[in-house]
Amino acid sequence: MTKKKILVLSDHPLSPSGVGTQTKYMIEALLKTGRYQFICLGGAVKHENYTPQKVDPWGDDFRIFPVDGYGNHEIIRSVLQKERPDALWFMTDPRFYGWLWEIENEVRANLPMVYYHVWDNFPPPKFNADFYNSNDVVACISKVTHEILKTVAPEVESHYLPHAVNETY
């Protein structure tokens, strides 16, 4: 069986941020199925160490490349060409991904863009419509977000997919 390769853009999955921990929980749950591999651009304002990591016990199936911010056009183009991922999954506030949506036609010609998103208050942010419409799927972390998506960008496929929870804690 060939594993699906997912390119992930988010906070560094081993960081203690909410975005980082949610990303890690999602990745680990999918790795346990044996059907996926993850190449992560682990975002931060600045890293102390930019050495790529293979996360134990997953090895080549869970690789992290530390990046400043969440990446840029050149990094995405390079990763798409070298790694040939099957999907792009990304998470954090939309204001950090304007650069990505600038090249969404380029990206979406090769693989679907899945945005894991939360916007927790009304009124619906109509100013985000272009961002929402630049994805193949928006996975909504809250029911409020899902209602907002159905209002602001009804033509975009969206699903309610709440935060992951580590059952150990």
Residue ranges and their predicted role:
Residues 1-54, 83:
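N-terminal subdomain of nucleotide-sugar transferases
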Residues 48-75:
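Conserved nucleotide-sugar phosphate-binding/catalytic loop shared by glycosyltransferases and other
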Residues 110-112, 137, 157:
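Proline-centered loop/turn at the N-terminus of a beta-strand
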Residues 144, 164:
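Carbohydrate-associated surface elements
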